[in-house]
Amino acid sequence: MTNDGSSEQSKVAKVLGFFGVPVLAQSAAQFRHNFVADEISSKVRLFCSSDIFWRLLEDIERSPVGIQQWQEQVHSAFIYAGSDVDALRKLARKLTGDKEATLNDMNRSARDMLVSDGVVGFCGVMAGVSLTPSDANVDHSFLLYSSTRVATNIISIGQGAVFSKLEYQGITVFFSTTKEIIDLDAKISTGVFDVRDHVLSAVPIVSYIRWAFTEHWHAPEINASLVVDDPVLKQSYGFLNFQEFLSLMRRHRFSTNVAFIPWNWRRSSPAVVRLFRENPEAYSISVHGCDHTSAEFGSSDRQLLCWKAKQALARMDLHESRTGVHHDRVMVFPQGVFSEAAMSVLKQTDLIATVNNDTISVDLHPLAITTSDVWDIAVMRYSDFPIFTRRYPWEGIENFAFDALLGKPAIIVIHHDFCGDGCLKLIDFVDRMNTLRGRLNWRSLGEVVSRSCRQRELLAGVMEVEMYGTELRVQNPSGQPKHFVIRKREHDPSAIKCIHAGSRQLSWKFSGSQIDFELELKSYESTTVRIKFHEIGLDGRSEENLSYKIRTMMRRYLSEVRDNYCIRHMPSFVSRHFKVN
């Protein structure tokens, strides 16, 4: 329910739309009319402010019929703080049954918030997570204190609750004491979403939608991978010893992808190659640029970018042929730098996706990135080619947990120097990741990408799936045949060469800003869908003259001197003077 011009209800509608939930916005008067007239066809999930909800309860309680209709027609309600603090206080006391219940202003010295698992399955991966909110979270928020046992605190600070599960006349009411609802259209200047800045405006409503609507978009599984940037495949690289690291992976249940610089394709150690080849469930490699020179994929020159991409993939193919180590066709940008042109070019290669920390291009006038963009499984703003986002461990377990709540894969990035304490910080972090609610599936980076999608059941035996990378693993885990309707965002259908499911070519259709195709899978059957794009032709031009080759070689060798010797023995000197990448 909404008042005319309510900005928060508009934000609620956007969040519901993001999860694919249909919305019927009504004024309080319209809802009360339909409610009294018994014109509500199915049980509703109600979203409104405390001001409106308080007035609704006053209307309901005017007759026994009103209470009966409430019980018969409402599934549950999500209530957030309105502008009338007195109405919020009265509502809190009514729902808790505690006439002495108090609402205190949150202050900027607020302690850690704890997300409870008191309502089984409600908070998903976030259950049990503790996080420290930023100052932005405490404005327009209150702490609810009540001595009754009616309330279940879902998000709390000490004994006070900021989000609670209550009841009214036998119907579950989720009660948030903040006035803010996350705005999915808000631009993110950094391109990175930090849940610590939006705990109260985001976690309650996302948790409720996932709990209340069985038909919402969701990820079929939570996948994870640790990515280590840059190492040459030799016995040791900086603080990283591949044999010892394998033992850690086995003991602590995780997998590692090496973002491998194609320039190093002839330099892998036979012993380490054998280690990777014999342990594909633990070790994998992806494509980390081409030469790893400064901003090599930040150019706007499409021919140069195409040449770089093709050279990188050719080198990776040579490395695979030479060593037998398969590589994931996923690009990890050196220094995180990319341009819009680079994304357009990479889409028309054999790469299936990109993985990056940054989501804003280095173009003079970059595209704006919104909250909705970074909440998605992958950022799809650049030529409909995905950027799967990754994070450093120091961004907090809470950010990885919230990503997983949204359905995003957990891609963790480190450099070898993060292992400088004998991997203690890393292992502590991985162990905490593995204790999150919901099983993490540690996979190669390519598997993480190809298994990342969101889906929902349209009808019995019919699944709608949205794919992001140009390769998707589709599975039917049920004992019955299942029909899959698959869609992918695409604004340039003329770029598509063909679509295959295994060896079978599929027909597809273009509709607005997406392509759609369908397939049938027998019980317990799986297949891999691949979208192939027309390649870009080269004009034969190359920037790789002798001077460039020498400078690139010096850059790579100096980087290894830094990582293998200087950082280990002269870390303070390196941090001040040695900036080769």
Regions found by a protein language model. Give the residues of each.
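Helical hinge/lid and interdomain linker segments adjacent to catalytic or ligand-binding clefts
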Residues: 7-87
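A glycine-centered loop/beta-turn motif at secondary-structure junctions
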Residues: 15-18, 42-43, 75-76, 118, ...
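C-terminal domain-boundary segment and adjacent tail
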Residues: 25-27, 205, 209-211, 216-220, ...
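A glycine-rich, often tryptophan-bearing local segment used as a flexible ligand/cofactor-contacting loop or short
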Residues: 56-127
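Metal-dependent polysaccharide deacetylase catalytic core of the NodB/CE4 family, i.e.
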Residues: 73, 79-93, 101-108, 253-346, ...
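Active-site beta->alpha N-cap acidic-glycine motif
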Residues: 191-281, 328
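Catalytic grooves of carbohydrate-active enzymes
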Residues: 211-240, 321-332, 336-343, 349, ...
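Alpha-helical scaffold elements lining the catalytic groove of polysaccharide deacetylases
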Residues: 236, 293-322, 365-402
